[in-house]
Design a protein with these regions (language model features):
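Short, well-formed alpha-helical segments that are part of the catalytic scaffolds
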Residues: 17-30, 52
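Acidic donor-binding segment of Leloir-type glycosyltransferases
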Residues: 29-96
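Active-site nucleotide-sugar/metal-binding loop of Leloir-type enzymes
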Residues: 110-122
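Conserved donor NDP-sugar-binding/catalytic core segment of glycosyltransferases
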Residues: 136-171
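Conserved nucleotide-sugar donor-binding catalytic segment
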Residues: 156, 174-266
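Catalytic core of nucleotide-sugar-dependent glycosyltransferases
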Residues: 186, 226, 249-257, 263-292, ...
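Membrane-interface aromatic/basic loop that binds lipid-linked glycans or pyrophosphate carriers
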Residues: 302-360
Length: 360
């Protein structure tokens, strides 16, 4: 099929977000652009009725009349629908309703989108529970990257929506810090790795697809090592070009808070923290950074979190060497297999997270 000359692909990966996906799709279709763009929505075999929500939205808002460009097709992995929006003629949807959950099988999904992605100069990610509120987001960001060929990624300010309280939060300190580093491109990567001091929210981003594709092998390797992949992507994109920050709030990041007082949740939380600590140390060495104070900080954080996680999973094998300057901490690590020590740490963490959750 002959497609329009799409300039931007919107990448939306979603699973069991039936309550929120309409907000995301409304954010896509509201975009006012001077160019055609395609929104690739991949539902990973949701079990909460999300696929039905998406189908209903597409049927109601997209053109399936005789002579339209719309089509349905089935492959061995998905049912696919492609159509043009009824009112916003520059907006197209390509929706993939996956037949099997790929995340649980660790099967990649990006390859399914090459039919549309490969023709696009830029890509804008937005997961199914987040959404855009600025109708000019794509237009402004594309224009900036068109005019600044040395820039590989741009992003904007964001506000958080706390789902269980209904409150919005705007982090003023992030805005000020991000703007202060606009002329210090040389230290932005360090400040991304250092607890996200330089903050990039995924659904505010637009980056060059060609640069992303050139990093695919590296990114695939990182995804096999770490539980979070966006930070490594930002670092690699910035290594290949400049980054631009726009203080305009274009997007909303939704936070769904749940109970962390149960042991299984605490273990998963610690595992996520540990993966982040591993990633920071690994990327410090991988990118050849030269800041000994930052290295010492990352190393200390890694040891502390690893020490705590061992209370829950004594079989976990580290893949990053530890450097010990303090014999006491080295000794404590060596006795972590002691059952009593593990129980004490578990009880302490259960109490800590319970109190922290109560006072939120």
């Amino acid at each position: 099929m002959e497609y329009p000359k799409f300039k931007v692909t919107v990448s939306c990966m979603t699973y069991n977000q039936s309550k929120y996906i309409t907000d995301a799709m409304n954010g896509f279709t509201m975009q006012q652009t001077s160019f055609p763009f395609v929104c690739t929505i991949v539902d990973d075999a949701s079990t909460d009725g999300e696929q039905e929500v998406i189908r209903k939205y597409v049927e109601d808002n997209f053109d399936f009349s005789e002579g339209s460009v719309a089509y349905h097709k089935e492959t061995d992995y998905a049912h696919i629908t492609y159509a043009q929006h009824k009112a916003n003629k520059n907006c197209y949807f390509a929706v993939l309703y996956l037949k099997e959950n790929h995340y649980s099988q660790r099967k990649p999904k990006m390859g399914y989108l090459s039919e549309w992605r490969d023709m696009c100069e830029y890509e804008a990610p937005c997961e199914g529970d987040d959404y855009w509120i600025d109708p000019d987001k794509l237009q402004k960001q594309k224009r900036y990257l068109d005019d600044h060929k040395d820039c590989s990624i741009c992003h904007t300010n964001v506000k958080w929506y706390i789902q269980n309280t209904g409150k919005y939060i705007i982090k003023q300190e992030w805005k000020e810090f991000n703007k202060s580093l606009e002329s210090r491109q040389d230290i932005i990567i360090e400040n991304i790795l250092d607890s996200n001091k330089y903050y990039i929210q995924t659904n505010t981003v637009l980056y060059r697809t060609k640069v992303y594709n050139s990093l695919s092998d590296e990114l695939l390797g990182f995804r096999k090592l770490f539980l979070l992949g966006d930070t490594t992507l930002w670092c690699l994109l910035i290594r290949h070009g400049k980054i631009h920050y726009d203080e305009t709030i274009t997007s909303v990041y939704r936070i769904n808070t749940g109970s962390v007082s149960h042991q299984n949740n605490i273990e998963k939380k610690l595992r996520f923290y540990l993966s982040g600590a591993e990633m920071r140390l690994y990327m410090y060495n991988y990118l050849g950074l030269n800041n000994i104070q930052l290295f010492d900080k990352f190393n200390a954080e890694y040891k502390q979190i690893f020490f705590l996680y061992r209370a829950y999973n004594r079989n976990y094998v580290r893949f990053i060497d530890m450097k010990w300057n303090n014999k006491i901490f080295e000794h404590l690590y060596n006795i972590m297999d002691n059952f009593i020590t593990s129980c004490v740490i578990k009880r302490f963490l259960s109490f800590y997270f319970l109190i922290k959750n109560i006072h939120k």
